[in-house]
Amino acid sequence: MEFSAKNALIPGSFDPITLGHLDVIIRASGIFDRVTVAVLANAEKHTMFTVDERLAMVSLAIEDEGLKNVGAVSWDGLTSDA
């Protein structure tokens, strides 16, 4: 992934996504041209939901808010490698 000053990366486990997470995403969408929400997969962390379920929840929240400049991806590497 390539990022510039006009792009933002919001990493997290989102297990599950909360209104607080969504507030940060909405605010970022108003500041940046493109926002990518990275749903982190960490095999060592015990989560309530699978990464696919968390990605689906995040994607649904983004769609429900009508955020056209926001996308969600799953990520299993270091955030610094994104």
Describe each PLM feature range:
Residues 1-82:
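Nucleotidyltransferase catalytic core that binds NTPs
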